[in-house]
Amino acid sequence: WIEKRFREFLESKMFKGLGTERMVKGSDPHSPISQIAKKVHDQFVFIMSLNKTFIIKKERLKTAFNFLLPVKTFEELKIPLQVTATDIQTGEIQVYSSGDLLEAVVRSSSIPGYVEPTFQDNKIIVDGGVGLPNPVSILKPLVDFTIAVDVKRKIVPDLADLNIFEILQRSELVGYTKLLDNLLKEADIIIKPDIMNDHWSHFNLFDKFLTNGISAANEQLPDIISKLSKSNSWSNRFKRWFDQKTL
């Protein structure tokens, strides 16, 4: 159902209205934030002249997720879900696990500088990946076993045309990559699909991304089964129970 629905979405006017094909041209950046930096940079003067804080309205993203999500509240889900977002006023991580699922997912996907942020009380809420690129730490106390998926792009030596913008962008990339690597260490299993170092918005490569993701997961199956078996042992269960009680 998920794959079929997503393919329908890629052919819809809703998808075209998001403008993802215009995000990155030429030299693609790598991390979730720097991936959008090129787009923001190209329109910087225009945005500043209008005193704007985003390129596309939040409602466009909400319309897209309204089509993609089969349910609209956390309570309707068969498997519990934690959704994260970031308050860029304080840097605090916002975790949503009940109530309006659609609103939570939209907040978690609001790329700063591209999608309109959510203003609530004194908070300015944007993409969860800003403060927590991979939310293993959120799930660790709640589950017995964690599987993370690493789809970050590699740092490649492409700083031939050195300038201030490239230096700032590469500095952000290095910091993001190091943070993500440390976060991933908390996972029991890490699945690393071959994304061919392509930008995540290259939806024309959906079939390759899907195939490579399935392949990477299948390669990890023996390790997953082995570690799950050990994880379910009485001693490990007792240790996890004790750790949770002492948090």
Regions found by a protein language model. Give the residues of each.
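Patatin-like phospholipase
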Residues: 1-247
